[in-house]
Amino acid sequence: MATRGAVAAAASTIWKHRRNPSLRSLSRHFNPNFNHRIIPTGFKYQVRAIQGTSTDPVITPLKNREEPKPQNWKIKMLYDGDCPLCMREVNMLMERNEKHGTIKFVDISSNDYSPEDNQGLDYKTVMGQIHAIQSDGNVVKGVEAFRRLYEEVGLGWVYTITKFEPIGKLADVVYDVWAKYRLQVTGRPSIEAILEARKKDKVETCGESKNCKI
């Protein structure tokens, strides 16, 4: 604003100087200098990254944060924490659940996962497709599990259409295909190889303990 005012004043003076010869004598005294830049107070320059480094803040994945464990949860989500694609959806639900507090998240890939605490659902079974456990002990899976989970965080409308036929059956078929090939699509070993690796890891971690569960 100040720079534009100075330019306007200079232009007005020069114009009058041309029209009125009596002002020519002022030209030797009038020598405006516009080399100084005026920087508005409070203006901050944006710093660019140098040589490919990023200035974006490091965001801790929700998977690595302490998972909320609401006392009055309405549904428990059993998820595969080693699935990078799956974790995008899990992270979104975790964020939404911070407000609602109705979902309890259980990572089946954790060494602490216990089938006994989750209606007897073992690792291999839950790896086959998504499972969720309602507070009354009822187990839901597949598309229905997603629908119940989304409803608890205010996004029930996303899966509302799957309540109606034939859309519901079609959604189940599509999900079943995805669940069947999920490991290959995400570049992971077969379920047999994963189970064998978990078994070895359990042996190394637990030693001679009788309480470890595969």
UniProtKB/Swiss-Prot annotation:
One of its GO terms (biological process) is tissue regeneration. Signal peptide: none annotated. Residues 1-49 form a transit peptide. It comes from the Eukaryota. Keywords: Chloroplast, Plastid, Transit peptide. Pfam families: DCC1-like. GO terms for molecular function: protein-disulfide reductase activity. It is found in: Plastid, Chloroplast. InterPro entries: DCC1-like (IPR007263), DCC1_Trx (IPR044691), Thioredoxin-like_sf (IPR036249). GO terms for cellular component: chloroplast; mitochondrion. This is Uncharacterized protein At5g50100, chloroplastic.
